[in-house]
Amino acid sequence: MVKLDNVTEGVLDVINDNKFSQTGAFNLRENGTSICHGDSEHIKIKKKTDKPGIDIYIDGKTDGEAVYIPVVLSKSGMTDLVYNDFYVEDGADVRIVAGCGIHNSGCNESRHDGIHTFHVGKNANVRYEEKHYGEGNGTGARVLNPVTNIFVGENSVFTLDTAQIKGVDSTVRETLSLIHISEPT
């Protein structure tokens, strides 16, 4: 288990409702680097080899399980770009808890651009929770720019629950959703 500093623990408590732990399926990204991750029986997380980010594979036997993928930035002047791709098999029922917190006590802008793409199979149920939060007594801006691409299969449900808690100076959100529509019979 990786020992987390007080700033990271405090930010995680806010963006993950005191529920992040280094058990089950999880990946914690801190200051541009994945510092710890774990898999479960039905959820596997793999580091990308061609660009920063992870691929999350959720098998069809997943039933009510949660996966945590928070990001914490605590260095002033940092820009973090990450590509996370989710592959949800037919029939899966999963809760994905993301979120980003920036602690900026410096004078330079800190920024996180998270590009998340969801490939959801048929008859699946996905709940995606994303919270954004900023803190720190510095004058540097706290900027979060999420991009969410959602491709939903037949008879699937995708719930997007996003909140900006406080302390974020600027956000541009982009969301694209393509939903399978059955042909009339």
Residue locations for each model-derived region?
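Ser/Thr-centric signal marking residues that sit
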Residues: 185
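Short, Gly/Pro- and small/polar-rich lid/capping loops
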Residues: 1-41
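Conserved beta-strand/loop scaffold segments within soluble protein domains that form the structured core
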Residues: 24-28, 35-178, 182
